[in-house]
Amino acid sequence: MNFDKKQLRNTLLLLLGALIWGTAFVAQSVGSGYVGPYTFLAARSWLACAFLIVLVLLRRGKARKADPGVPFWINGRMLLRGGVFCGIALFAASAAQQIGIGTTSTAKAGFLTALYVVLVPLLGVFFGRRPGVKLGICACISLAGLYLLCLAGHDTLTLTGGEWMLLLCSLLFAFQIMLVDHYSPRLDGVQLSFAEFFATAVLSTIFMFVFETPTFAQIQGAAVSIAYCGILSSGVAYTLQIVGQKELDPTIASMAMCMESVFSALAGWLILGQTLSGVELAGCALMCAAIMGAQIPEKVRS
């Protein structure tokens, strides 16, 4: 059985991003105790921009040394469009998540947010990216595993007002994944990530000054959380998403990214001493099986 090496590599990049997002959950929770959602999002986004522009300068400087005629910004107009559209989607999804996350349990919040694992294949039909039977089955298996991990024995599926915001968040994240799928093959991954976070930072800053009154002391209190989320969760993990989604089916990408829930649970188990029941471990196993099943090449009919 011959696996697609590029697909496997890109899936592993997305899994690494999901690992960073999963372990960043504690940092986000701590940071939210000091500053409002828009302040936290603005601070981490500007920090991500600072981190990414250094990478852009280093990479483009090296490329222009080899060929002085190479433009600094690759496909500038498309980069502007992609950065704005992806940034708006990321800002809206992150804001909806932050607003809704305080209204329900962590388990239900994790489940509702990660529902993009089934929304992406559905949106793919409208974007001309039909997932196929195998990937559709794998997405459903991943959803079943997500339910066992997050909700089995804990919550009902009755939704409150804030939980509808989390459902909206999952739809917006699905759109963001599809937008990255559209733009990433045509653009430099690091440059697109910078443009995306620049748009997110500008929008977050506007909303911060309209709806919140942050102080320097508050931001200082959340500094460690902002640094972790800004550099690793935003600067590194979302860049891994953009690079990893190149030439990868968005359904596989969504399954890899929703492994964030598994890594978050495992981090709590290993680092914080939290317990995982047999049902929750079975959910983790199902989600891992779905990811591995998605890597198996389909038989080509002659």
Predicted features along the sequence, with ranges:
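Glycine-/small-residue-enriched transmembrane alpha-helix faces in small-molecule transporters
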Residues: 1-43, 87-88, 92, 96, ...
